[in-house]
Amino acid sequence: MKTITIPRQNLTQYEIMLIMRPDLPEEKFLKFLSEIKEHAKRNLALEFNLSNRGRRKLAYAMRKFQDGIYIQFNFLGSGYILNSLIKRLKLEESILRYIVQKT
C-alpha cells in the first residue's frame, strides 16, 4: 500500500458538534463513536479528539425529542477528510443535528 503524506501547513483545525438521539442504546452509541474514530484515522486525520458533552435539554424539539446527547470532535485535517466525515454523518439516522466549524 502506498503511503500518502500531507504537508502539515496545508491542514486545518476543525470542530464538529453533534446532537444525537437520547433514546439511542449504549452499544449502538459506542459503536458509532468507534466507527467515526476509525474513519478519521483511515483518512489521515491528525490530533483527533472526541469528547462526550453529555445529555442536555434542547432549546426546541427536534424530531419530537426534547433532549439530546452532545458529542464534540476536534481534529486537524484536509478538506477531503472533512467531506468524507460529513458524508458519513449524513448517513447516520441517530444524528439529530450537526455543525462544522473551522477553528
From Swiss-Prot:
Keyword Plastid part of the UniProt annotation: yes
One of the GO BP terms on file: translation
Alphabetized UniProt keyword annotations: Chloroplast, Plastid, Ribonucleoprotein, Ribosomal protein, RNA-binding, rRNA-binding
The keyword Repressor is annotated on this UniProt entry: no
A single GO cellular-component term on record: chloroplast
InterPro entries noted in UniProt: Ribosomal_bS6, Ribosomal_bS6_sf, Ribosomal_S6_plastid/chlpt, Transl_elong_EF1B/ribsomal_bS6
One annotated GO molecular function: small ribosomal subunit rRNA binding
Domain of life: Eukaryota
Cellular localization per UniProt: Plastid, Chloroplast
Primary localization class, coarse: plastid
Pfam families: Ribosomal_S6 (PF01250)
UniProt similarity note: Belongs to the bacterial ribosomal protein bS6 family.
Annotated HAMAP family: Ribosomal_bS6 (MF_00360)
Role noted for this protein: Binds together with bS18 to 16S ribosomal RNA.
Name of the protein in its database record: Small ribosomal subunit protein bS6c
Species, as recorded: Cyanidium caldarium (Red alga)
